[in-house]
Amino acid sequence: MEFTPSFEQGTLIKRYKRFLTDIRLEDGSEVTIHCPNTGSMRNCLFEGKKVWFSISDNPKRKYSRTWEQAESDCGDIIGINTGRANQLAEDAIKSGVITELQDYDLLKREVKYGSENSRIDILLTDNDSHNEPKPHCYIEVKSCTLLEDGQGYFPDAVTTRGQKHLRELMEMVSMGHRAVLLFVVQHTGIESVMAAKHIDPDYAELLSQAHQAGVEILAYNTEMSPNQASLLKSCPVKL
């Protein structure tokens, strides 16, 4: 995924009111930008460190700048815009980077599914013309950015929505489909991922149940810069 134009740089002052962040531009002026991450952003807020942002030319937007990336105290790059995770996943499937998700004919986004009225992030299917078409593959994408004591964790806050998605994926497996939970690791310092039992024990328990039920758990690291981002390689998941 190429960013055109490239992201511009500033310095983090503070994040507040969930959707707003104050930064200092390179010319010394201070501005408020939109924060697209509605989570806790635990261990992602490093005041005084570099941030990168995109600029929209939409005149209807109150805040034209959107926070995209951040620098950690250790110099790692963190993808702040969780909305980019789905596109990163789609690009990686189409380019063959995610080897486990190849040889399907069609890719669809945001398809309704399940008994709890969810929308799957990515659905892979075969054409009906195949003599033996593969089972549908339902892929739920999650952005992982929490690094604590050298370990990557998900989630960074209690997520009832994430719990619902795990139940939906297990339901798809019970119906004979393929179901995948894909962690897009948007933190260059994370080398492995595990459930954050200390933050959301219910999610951790459901993740274990989902794995035992046949839901595939994958994680891929992201290579990031102000110019581009792409999934790079498989990342171990500790279950």
From Swiss-Prot:
Annotated signal peptide: none
**Which InterPro entries does its entry note?**
SfsA (IPR005224), SfsA_C (IPR040452), SfsA_N (IPR041465)
Per the record, the domain of life is: Bacteria
Gene3D superfamilies per record: 2.40.50.580, 3.40.1350.60
One GO MF term on file is: DNA binding
* Similarity-based family: Belongs to the SfsA family.
Tell me what this protein is called: Sugar fermentation stimulation protein homolog
